[in-house]
């Protein structure tokens, strides 16, 4: 061990490893906060109700709404359930999931094809009439339409 400590190569490699690892750690840690602030910088009066935006503000604002809270909880749960059905050891469960998914997709496509006229753009119909029949975003606390397309 004494011979190893005397060699200058050992000290250069140790110093180089320490410097490179510290540079990498600093480079990875520093821009994350500034990048987050740049992405969520308020560019208009309506972004996060005019406040300087951050991820914490967005999450806190979103979770105050009961519907958003349900979606926040349901999204990971639905992904986990989908993965459980797809990767289940019991082939009957997996096949049931695939058949149900295929059936729902076919029913949706048939419903869209029945209602869409030949002269109308299918994507426009799906967006305006089927998915967004109210013509705007509804306020969950009151039944009135907040924004209406003209």
Curated annotation (Swiss-Prot):
UniProt membrane topology term = Lipid-anchor; GPI-anchor
Which pairs are disulfide-linked?
none
Q: Which domain of life is it from?
A: Bacteria
Coiled-coil intervals in this record? none
**What InterPro entries does the record tag this protein with?**
DUF3713
Its main subcellular localisation, reduced to a broad class, is membrane
Official protein name in the record = Uncharacterized lipoprotein MPN_442
């Amino acid at each position: 061990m004494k011979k190893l400590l005397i060699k200058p190569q050992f000290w250069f490699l140790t110093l180089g490893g320490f410097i490179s690892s510290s540079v990498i750690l600093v480079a990875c840690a520093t821009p994350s906060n500034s990048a987050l602030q740049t992405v969520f910088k308020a560019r208009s009066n309506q972004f996060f109700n005019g406040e300087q935006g951050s991820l914490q503000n967005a999450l806190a604002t979103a979770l105050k709404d009961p519907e958003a809270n349900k979606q926040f909880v349901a999204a990971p749960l639905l992904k986990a359930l989908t993965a459980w059905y797809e990767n289940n050891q019991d082939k009957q469960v997996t096949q049931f999931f695939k058949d149900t998914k295929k059936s729902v997709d076919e029913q949706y496509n048939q419903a869209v094809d029945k209602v869409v006229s030949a002269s109308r753009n299918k994507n426009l119909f799906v967006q305006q009439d089927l998915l967004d029949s109210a013509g705007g975003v509804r306020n969950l606390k009151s039944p009135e339409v907040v924004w209406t397309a003209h």
